[in-house]
Amino acid sequence: MASTIMSQEVSWTDILEKHPALRWIKPIPEDWEIFPKHLCAFESFLYVAVGQEVRSLDCRLLKHKNEASHKNFYKKLFNPELDFMIEQICLSKNGRFLAVVGKSKIVILGLRSKLSEQNPLAESVSNFGESVNNFSNSEHQENGTNSLKLSEVTICSVAVINPSSQIVSVRFHPLGKSGRSLVVLTETSLLLYEAGNGVLMPDYEIPLKLTHQASNSFDADVDLHIPTAFCFSNVSQGWGVFTIYILTRGGDVFSVCPVMPANAMIPQDVLKQIRLILTKKEDDADAENHRRNVHWITKLLGEAALANDLSTSFVISEGSSELFDSSDYVSVRRPDDFSFIPSMQGPFLLQPAVADDELIEDYCDIYSFGMNPIDVLAIGGSEGRLDLLLLVSEVSGRWSKLNDHGLASMKLIVSQVHSLYLSNNNPYMVLQPDIQSPYSLIAYHANGLHVVDIESWARDLNLNFENSEFLNNEEENDEDELSNVLVSIPSRTSVLERLDTNPLNESTDAVVGCAQLYYPSLGKILISLTRNWQTTVFDDSDLATMGVNKESLSNEMDYSKSLGTSSLEQVDDLDEKLTYTPLYVSLLEKTPFTDPSIPSLVERTIVPAELQNEITVSSASLRFLGKVVARYRETLNLLDHGCSELHHRLKLQREEYERQQNHIYKLSDRISNFREKAWSTEHLEHLTSDMSMCEKRIDQVLQRVMDLRVPDLSDKEKQFIKEIGNYKEKVTGERGIEKRVETLKTLLQRTKPRDAQTTLVASSSDMRLAAIEQLQKLLAQQSLSIKELKTKTVSFQRLLQTS
């Protein structure tokens, strides 16, 4: 029984790292080709490709179920069409369809949706709901004491695709209705498919023309013109939602626009922006293309108007159990024209041009950040290099005749603004979006995983371009502002290394998959999978801390130091009478553990396979252990230095507390002496003079504060000045302490001993005792007010030092 119950102290992320669904029993040969994109996720479900099978895992069972049988449970998605080695898998946006990709075959599987389980109306939404929801549990297996439960689930294949050329990349179109529009990039063409039952033929085909040379001519750079990846433009305005960027091995970027699924869901805002294109005037050279764009847009708007008349106000989103307002989206069909097809545009000219020695010959992936109004593209190379490009030219719809597959003559320009060298000796690099921020992307390659963030400079760059006056203004100030943003891009681009799988530069354990889970009960999870089936999980605590640029940190520290020294110098320039001691200097100092050199992240490394089983002494093991020991030795040295600094800080605090305690003892002695001594008018006059001196000090401090801070006084400072005025009114007002002291003085003068009757002497002594008691209360109240006033002044002075 003890082996069947999972310990509650083990985190569910640790269980996920050792889950049997992410393991393969068969040994991996050394010459096995590396195929990335073996991992994808939707909400709490994780899908992984293992050999010729696809496994599904619900991460909610790992966190909310206590039995070991639930902890080790996963499903194997079985289909007779999966008879090939899987190279990549791709999931639709709504999580209903999974594309399993081989070298020359694609199988689209229909997955069970939450809507089909909860809402009976789902059957009317889907045209092939029976095939999608036809699940049958065929067997359950238990493996010894580990309680391994495997449920083999038969999935009816929605579609089978057999392209005529080798498959390069596969993605589901984000505008596709029901998520069944698949875009396939092969070595010769760009294909669009609408998922249905049986073997599919392409719904739309755009031949690739990646060079200006004739097809029958000799091309020395034919290997560089092979497509390697494509991505959708994430720009949500104008033509951007219909644009696809294609990357070649030589680093050339091409665009195809417009590319639209046969059945699409388009936002109303996009249609409003496209209407503006109808009023835009074009040059005479582009008159024919402008007429084609107007014809295509007019058909699209007609389909949208007809759909608005026939649709209801609220519909159920297919693949989800939520209602959404149909006034925000329009379901339209693609306006096909059988005599014209979208034309290839490019290649984009790189301005300014880079040197020949900086060029690499094998680019792998491309990604669009979707910035408005100027987009930022990222392209990754096999040598671990990541280039950031600004899309200077505006991409619009371009058309060509059906028999003419030439390139568009329009010159498009991109500008390379920064290059990052993430690693070396990489056969590939994969770029994918980050759920944490639209300004960041995840780049994983054979040697690890990095997160690149451009938010700090992308916002400033877009603000410059959004200003319409700036676009028509040639003043130097605006140009200088833009140039300052462009120059600061290298220093303001944040790069964080999440995983290092090659610490010795000799390992072959490459990252073959990366996925992100985002579910309310699970949080945000980043998962990576390596070739040797090593799984690494980063939860919210790991993802919360982002790398900070060292240069910006040093500038901020220098600025804070300059502010601190200037404020201390201003305090030292004050009169000695105005300084209140002791000051808590140690509390104003920065804690040593906020030093950015002390790492706050848990460093994750992949241990070599020879160290996981029986430890054998070899040169590689010794180098690895030496590197790990050196890293932790540096960290321990930093922590030791921080502990010594903290010990010194605590020592200063102890001395200050002891000094304050001695000061309190002295004050208590003085109070006891005051109580024992007889009160006289001279002593009251002395107290009155001290009170006036205190008022003068307060006035001087206020005057200096007003000179330094006006007109930039904060709300707390204004409130503090108001409180000081109230204290002054209590002391010097009509009903203040001074008036009451004057009355007591006259009362004491009247009660001096003189030759009188015993009854009068007795009455005068009683009056004297009553006056003394009242005076003691008044002095106690006065000392309390002065003490509060001193405390306020010290806190305000400390606030000035820290600001």
From Swiss-Prot:
InterPro entries: Nucleoporin_Nup88, NUP88/NUP82. It is a peripheral membrane protein. One of its GO terms (cellular component) is nuclear membrane. Keywords: Membrane, mRNA transport, Nuclear pore complex, Nucleus, Protein transport, Translocation, Transport. It is found in: Nucleus, Nuclear pore complex; Nucleus membrane. Transmembrane segments: none annotated. One of its GO terms (molecular function) is structural constituent of nuclear pore. Its main location: nucleus. GO terms for biological process: mRNA export from nucleus; protein import into nucleus; ribosomal large subunit export from nucleus; ribosomal small subunit export from nucleus. Component of the nuclear pore complex (NPC). NPC constitutes the exclusive means of nucleocytoplasmic transport. NPCs allow the passive diffusion of ions and small molecules and the active, nuclear transport receptor-mediated bidirectional transport of macromolecules such as proteins, RNAs, ribonucleoparticles (RNPs), and ribosomal subunits across the nuclear envelope. Functions as a component of the nuclear pore complex (NPC). NPC components, collectively referred to as nucleoporins (NUPs), can play the role of both NPC structural components and of docking or interaction partners for transiently associated nuclear transport factors. This is Nucleoporin nup82. It comes from Schizosaccharomyces pombe (strain 972 / ATCC 24843). The lineage of its organism: Eukaryota, Fungi, Dikarya, Ascomycota, Taphrinomycotina. The gene is nup82.
